[in-house]
Structures are given as C-alpha cells and as structure tokens.
Amino acid sequence: MKIKNNIALIGFMGAGKSSVSKLLSERLGKTLVSTDACIETREGLSIISIFKEKGEDYFRQMESRVLEDLCRQSGQIIDCGGGIVMRPPNLSLMRLNCLVIYLESRPEDLEARLKNHTNRPLYNAERLDKMLKLLESRLPLYRAAANITISTHNKSCHEVCEEIEDKLREYENTSG
C-alpha cells in the first residue's frame, strides 16, 4: 500500500501544525491547505468571530464540510484545526483519505507558545487548568486518528519536518 496522497496534520492548538505544514508542503511539493483558512474564506469571518457569532457547534459543522471537500482532492498537506478530532466522522474521513500525522506537544510547551496569542478562540480567555482538561479530553482522539505521531518537544520546525520525512519513508517501506 502506498502512502495516501493527502497528509493531514493534527494536534492541539499551539503544537506547530501551521508552521510545520507550510514547510512540509514546500519540502514535499504538495499544496498547503488550512481547514481554518477555508472556513474563514467560506464564512467571510475570522475563526474568533465565527465562535462568537455562531457558536462552536456551527464551526464544527463547517469544519466537517471543509474536510469532506478537501478529502475529495489529492496532493495536499492539510493543516487541521486543533478540534477537528472532536467529531467521529472526521476521524473516519481523515483515516480513509489521508495519512494522519499527530504533532504531540507537552502542555508546558503549548502554554509557552500560546500565552502571547490572542487569536485562539478556545485559549485566549481560558486558564491553564482548562487548557489541560481540553488537551486531556482530546489526547485519545489524536492518538486514535494518527498513523504517525511526532513529538515536537525541543525541536525546530525543520527538525520536525525531517522526522516526518523519515517516518514517511519508513511508513511507505512497511506498508508497501
């Protein structure tokens, strides 16, 4: 079995999905798409505004529709929103149509990356204990969805991409 043509990066907000997916798309010659950017384009609103004006349930429905559309295409690096794993159909869709890579980050690393960001809808008003509970609730879902897990602890974006490329080669050799 060859590697699926789409690669989906999943992980908690602040794990580095956007930075890694950008570099990885350049290195692998694949098109970069972001579920959040697609939603913002379709809605004409920022993610923060969608959460405020229409609620998280509406956002998650849009996220599922965008993922369905993206999975009909090929040759992409899909930068997934941190909560995409919250809906079971998304997990099935990703596993069927993508090689799913989970960027695993330690809570203290996430906190350090997120504390200066105000554009995180589920973080900006939340305290660390709430973030930890949210992360804890998603961990089993990230792990269940992932074909490959990469720790981002103490690694640069380039190091994470190199490790992903190594894992992709290993995955292709063991799967094919």
UniProtKB/Swiss-Prot annotation:
Cofactor binding notes: Binds 1 Mg(2+) ion per subunit.
Coiled-coil region: none
Binding site for substrate: 36, 60, 82, 138
Keywords for the protein's UniProt record, in alphabetical order: Amino-acid biosynthesis, Aromatic amino acid biosynthesis, ATP-binding, Cytoplasm, Kinase, Magnesium, Metal-binding, Nucleotide-binding, Transferase
Matches recorded under InterPro entries: P-loop_NTPase (IPR027417), Shikimate/glucono_kinase (IPR031322), Shikimate_kinase/TSH1 (IPR000623)
Residues at which ATP binds: 14-19, 120
Domain of life: Bacteria
Localization, UniProt: Cytoplasm
Annotated binding of Mg(2+), by residue: 18
Gene Ontology molecular functions: ATP binding; magnesium ion binding; shikimate kinase activity
Cofactor(s) required, per the database record: Mg(2+)
Pfam family, one: SKI
Function statement: Catalyzes the specific phosphorylation of the 3-hydroxyl group of shikimic acid using ATP as a cosubstrate.
Homology family: Belongs to the shikimate kinase family.
Assembly mode: Monomer.
Name this protein carries in UniProt: Shikimate kinase
Native species: Dehalococcoides mccartyi (strain ATCC BAA-2266 / KCTC 15142 / 195) (Dehalococcoides ethenogenes (strain 195))
